[in-house]
């Protein structure tokens, strides 16, 4: 029997094509490729904070194609091609380690080229489903070094719980006190294009200072900074900075920005921004 390949899931965001411009969705998500018991290729996307899939597409065996956008400077923008139509669904990779992109492409090629045997329909009814290959981000040793690995969950032989045990567990958890989950503050929710563009419009001096850090071809047009704020490269940079702060590198980043690190910079994004604000106020008072 031609056994179906493992499912592949990795961090990826959505993007939208408008005319000839691809605009990235700032949300973080997961993109999953797999093969159904019927032999169809299934592609699903969901936000990381939800278990519900927003996108779900099915392809006949051998017809799914996940193609890299050659015009993208970072090389991390892809589109899902639909043969026989002009439809294209765009996604951009959000894994921190760019070098791991090749592993993702290789794993997807296996799924794209999978063609089930004619007798697979009968055997798949009693066959066990393939495990999922999750391409996940391991904690880096420093904010610039990341690792991406393919992990395969081990099969379990634990027998299913009885109905009596399930009822007991439900009763146990129903009596436990619940605590409201505090939303995590991230730079991605603060430094959005929707927030930054009006701010820069009202602060032209800051905008002028930032333009000098753009590529030379962008510096001639001040409005090009708006395009940068919507780009996948900018969103990826914000996500990497977020990760470094949450991994405890806030004091180092504060120091690189020319401010004196405080204990607050070790307390996530909120503490990091508080440290920056305090440093800015201190410099103003010393003038």
UniProtKB/Swiss-Prot annotation:
Annotated Polar residues bias: 143-152
Keywords: Cytoplasm, Nucleus, Phosphoprotein, Proteasome
Domain DEUBAD per the UniProt entry, residue ranges: 177-286
TM region(s), chain numbering: none
Domain Pru per the UniProt entry, residue ranges: 2-118
Family note: Belongs to the ADRM1 family.
Protein's recorded name: Proteasomal ubiquitin receptor ADRM1 homolog
Native organism taxonomy: Eukaryota, Amoebozoa, Evosea, Eumycetozoa, Dictyostelia
């Amino acid at each position: 029997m031609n056994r179906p390949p493992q499912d592949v899931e990795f961090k990826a965001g959505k993007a939208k094509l408008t005319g000839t411009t691809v605009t990235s969705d700032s949300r973080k998500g997961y993109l999953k490729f797999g093969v159904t018991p019927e032999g169809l290729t299934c592609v699903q996307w969901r936000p990381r904070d939800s278990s519900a899939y927003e996108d779900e597409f099915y392809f006949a065996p051998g017809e799914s194609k996940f193609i890299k956008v050659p015009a993208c400077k970072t090389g991390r923008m892809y589109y899902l091609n639909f043969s026989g139509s002009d439809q294209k669904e765009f996604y951009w990779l959000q894994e921190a380690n760019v070098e791991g992109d090749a592993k993702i492409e290789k794993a997807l090629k296996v799924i794209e080229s999978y063609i089930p045997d004619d007798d697979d329909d009968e055997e798949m009814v009693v066959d066990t489903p393939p495990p999922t290959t999750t391409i996940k981000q391991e904690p880096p040793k420093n904010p610039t070094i990341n690792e991406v690995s393919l992990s395969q969950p081990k099969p379990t032989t634990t027998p299913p719980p009885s109905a009596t045990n399930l009822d007991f567990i439900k009763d146990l958890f129903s009596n436990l006190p619940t605590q409201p989950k505090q939303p995590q503050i991230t730079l991605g929710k603060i430094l959005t294009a929707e927030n930054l563009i009006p701010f820069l419009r009202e602060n032209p001096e800051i905008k002028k200072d930032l333009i000098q850090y753009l590529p030379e071809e962008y510096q001639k047009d001040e409005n090009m900074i708006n395009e940068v704020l919507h780009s996948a490269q900018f969103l990826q940079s914000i996500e990497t900075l977020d990760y470094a702060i949450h991994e405890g590198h806030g004091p180092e980043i504060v120091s690189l920005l020319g401010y004196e690190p405080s204990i607050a910079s070790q307390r996530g994004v909120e503490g990091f921004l508080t440290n920056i604000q305090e440093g800015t106020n201190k410099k103003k008072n010393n003038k």
